[in-house]
C-alpha cells in the first residue's frame, strides 16, 4: 500500500484539503432513517465504539458488535463493554456477513489488519465506516470497489459523544465519503444517517473529505491540543518550583488552569479568554504570545510539512513495526516528569485566580491556537476545519489534564495522537526551557502581576485588542459558535 494523498496530483490534493462546508439542519430532515431496518455492526468497543453504539441504538438503529473470537473467549474489556450494555456480541464470521454497514472503531494501528480481515466477509454492496481516515489516507488501504466507504468523525472523546446525546444535543462532527468508493452514490445518505444516529447533526456537521479530516486532525492533536499542553505544563512547573512556589499550588494551577482558561475559549474565542485578564495582564499576555509565536512558528510549520508529505506517518508506522518502542519509552519519560508527580494539595484557587496567576498559560493558548490555525490554512486546509482542530477541541483535551494530569490526556487520546504529541513536546520542551523561560518571571506564572492599577496606555490597548479580535480564527469561530448555539436552542428547546 502507498500513501493515498501522495498519489493525487496537486490540484486533487488542494481540492481534497479544501473540502469543508457547514451543513444545514434541513439536510438531516430524515435523521437516521436511511439506516433503519439495516444491520450496523461495530468492530471495536472502546470509548468511541461503545458510546457511538449506545447513541445509535437509542436513535432506533439495529447495532451489534463484532469482536475477535479470542476477545469473546477471554471476556476482555471490549466484550464486557458491549455485553453489559445489552448489545448482541459475536465473532467477525458470525456478524460481518449480515452487516449493511460495518464501522471500524479500533485504534489506527489495528486498521489494516481489521479491514483485511473483515473485507472478505462483507456482503456485496455493503458499506465500511471509519471515524478517522488514517488507514485510507496515510496507509492507502485499497477497499473492494463494490463497497461504499464513509466517515463520521465526532470532534471530541467518546464519553462526550454520549453525554451530549443524553442532554438532547450532540457534538460537532465531520462527515465524508471516500471518492474512490461510492459505487451506488449512497455514501452521503449513509454518512448523514450515521451522524444523525450519534446526535452529531444537532450540534452541526461539516461536509469534509478523508484527506482534510486526517491532515487537520493530525496537526491539531500534535501541536496545540496535546503537545503544547504537555510542553507548557512541564516548563511552567519547573519555573515555579525553581522560584520557590509551593509544589502543590504550582501543580494545581497548571492541572486545572488549562481547563479553566480554555473554557473561556469555548464561549467566546481568544478574544473572550484575553478579556478575562486585567488590562495590564492582557498586554503582558499578548507580548508573551507574540514572542512565543516567533519562536515556535518553525516547529509548527515543520509538523504541518511532515504531515502533508507523509513523513510523520512513515515515522510512526516504523515505530508500530518496532513494537512501539519509542511510544512506550516517551510515555514512561512523561510519567517521570516533576509535574506528573507533584504532591496533591487542598489549596483553593478561584476561577479568576487561574487567569490572574496564569498569564503565561493564556499566552501559550493564544500563540498555540493561532500558530496551528495559520499552519493549517497556509497548507490549503479551510478555515472551518482548522478552527475545529485547534480552538474548538482544546477545552475537551484540557479537561483530560484536569482529571489525571498528562497521564489521562495521553490515555484518552489515540495512540496516533499520543505519538505525535511526544514528537512535538520532545522538541518544544527544551526549546521553551532554553530560549524562552529564562526571561519569564513568576509574575506571569504563579504569583500574578500584583498591579494596584488597571491603567495602561490607550493606544497600546487598542492595538492589542485589534490584533486579537481581527485574527481569522476569531472570525470563523464567531460564525461557527453561532451556528452551534442556534442548533442547540432548536435541539433542547431553549
Swiss-Prot record:
The keyword Oxidoreductase applies. It is an enzyme of class 1 (oxidoreductase). The active site is at 132. The lineage of its organism: Bacteria, Pseudomonadati, Pseudomonadota, Gammaproteobacteria, Vibrionales. Residues 209-344, 345-487 form the KARI C-terminal knotted domain. It catalyses: (2R)-2,3-dihydroxy-3-methylbutanoate + NADP(+) = (2S)-2-acetolactate + NADPH + H(+); (2R,3R)-2,3-dihydroxy-3-methylpentanoate + NADP(+) = (S)-2-ethyl-2-hydroxy-3-oxobutanoate + NADPH + H(+). Keywords: Amino-acid biosynthesis, Branched-chain amino acid biosynthesis, Magnesium, Metal-binding, NADP, Oxidoreductase, Repeat. Its cofactor is Mg(2+). Pathway: Amino-acid biosynthesis; L-isoleucine biosynthesis; L-isoleucine from 2-oxobutanoate: step 2/4; Amino-acid biosynthesis; L-valine biosynthesis; L-valine from pyruvate: step 2/4. It comes from the Bacteria. It comes from Aliivibrio fischeri (strain MJ11). InterPro entries: 6-PGluconate_DH-like_C_sf (IPR008927), 6PGD_dom2 (IPR013328), KARI (IPR013023), KARI_C (IPR000506), KARI_N (IPR013116), NAD(P)-bd_dom_sf (IPR036291). Binds 2 magnesium ions per subunit. NADP(+) binds at residues 45-48, 68, 76, 78, 108-110, 158. This is Ketol-acid reductoisomerase (NADP(+)). Residues 14-208 form the KARI N-terminal Rossmann domain.
Amino acid at each position: 500500500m502507498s500513501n493515498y494523498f501522495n498519489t493525487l496530483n496537486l490540484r486533487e490534493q488542494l481540492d481534497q484539503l479544501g473540502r469543508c462546508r457547514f451543513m444545514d439542519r434541513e439536510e438531516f430532515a430524515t435523521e437516521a432513517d436511511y439506516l433503519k431496518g439495516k444491520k450496523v455492526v461495530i468492530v471495536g468497543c472502546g470509548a468511541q465504539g461503545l458510546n457511538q453504539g449506545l447513541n445509535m441504538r437509542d436513535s432506533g438503529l439495529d447495532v451489534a458488535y463484532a469482536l475477535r473470537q479470542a476477545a469473546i473467549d477471554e471476556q476482555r474489556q471490549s466484550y464486557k463493554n458491549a455485553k453489559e450494555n445489552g448489545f448482541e456480541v459475536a465473532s467477525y464470521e458470525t456478524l460481518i456477513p449480515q452487516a449493511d454497514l460495518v464501522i471500524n472503531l479500533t485504534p489506527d494501528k489495528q486498521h489494516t489488519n481489521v479491514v483485511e480481515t473483515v473485507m472478505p466477509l462483507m456482503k456485496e454492496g455493503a458499506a465500511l465506516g471509519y471515524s478517522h481516515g488514517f488507514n485510507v489516507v496515510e496507509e492507502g488501504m485499497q477497499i473492494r470497489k463494490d463497497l461504499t466507504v464513509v466517515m463520521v468523525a465526532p470532534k471530541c472523546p467518546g464519553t462526550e459523544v454520549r453525554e451530549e446525546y443524553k442532554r438532547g444535543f450532540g457534538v460537532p462532527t465531520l462527515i465524508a465519503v471516500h471518492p474512490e468508493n461510492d459505487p451506488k452514490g449512497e455514501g452521503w445518505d449513509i454518512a448523514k444517517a450515521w451522524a444523525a444516529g450519534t446526535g452529531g447533526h444537532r450540534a452541526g456537521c461539516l461536509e469534509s473529505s478523508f484527506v482534510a479530516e486526517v491532515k487537520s486532525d493530525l496537526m491539531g492533536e500534535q501541536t496545540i491540543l496535546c503537545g503544547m499542553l504537555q510542553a507548557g505544563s512541564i516548563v511552567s512547573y519547573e519555573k515555579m518550583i525553581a522560584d520557590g512556589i509551593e509544589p502543590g499550588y504550582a501543580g494545581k494551577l497548571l492541572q486545572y488552569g488549562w481547563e479553566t482558561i480554555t473554557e473561556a475559549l469555548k464561549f467566546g474565542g481568544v478574544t473572550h479568554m484575553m478579556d478575562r485578564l486585567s488590562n495590564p495582564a492582557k498586554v503582558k499576555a499578548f507580548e508573551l504570545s507574540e514572542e512565543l509565536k516567533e519562536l515556535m512558528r518553525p516547529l509548527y510549520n515543520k509538523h504541518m510539512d511532515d504531515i502533508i508529505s507523509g513523513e510523520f506517518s512513515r515515522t510512526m508506522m516504523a515505530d508500530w513495526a518496532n513494537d512501539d518502542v519509542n511510544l512506550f519509552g516517551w510515555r514512561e519519560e512523561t510519567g517521570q516528569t516533576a509535574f506528573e508527580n507533584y504532591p496533591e494539595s487542598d489549596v483553593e484557587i478561584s476561577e479568576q485566580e487561574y487567569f490572574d496567576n496564569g498569564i503565561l498559560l493564556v499566552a501559550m493558548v493564544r500563540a498555540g491556537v493561532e500558530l496551528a490555525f495559520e499552519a493549517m490554512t497556509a497548507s490549503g486546509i479551510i478555515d472551518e476545519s482548522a478552527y475545529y482542530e485547534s480552538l474548538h477541541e482544546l477545552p475537551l483535551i484540557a479537561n483530560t489534564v484536569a482529571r489525571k494530569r498528562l497521564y489521562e490526556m495521553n490515555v484518552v487520546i489515540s495512540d496516533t495522537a499520543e505519538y505525535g504529541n511526544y514528537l512535538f513536546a520532545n522538541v518544544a520542551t527544551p526549546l521553551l526551557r532554553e530560549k524562552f523561560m529564562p526571561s519569564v518571571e513568576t509574575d506571569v506564572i504563579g504569583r500574578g502581576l500584583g498591579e494596584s492599577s488597571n491603567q495602561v496606555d490607550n493606544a497600546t490597548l487598542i492595538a492589542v485588542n485589534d490584533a486579537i479580535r481581527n485574527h481569522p480564527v476569531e472570525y470563523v469561530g464567531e460564525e461557527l459558535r453561532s451556528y452551534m448555539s442556534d442548533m442547540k436552542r432548536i435541539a433542547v428547546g431553549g
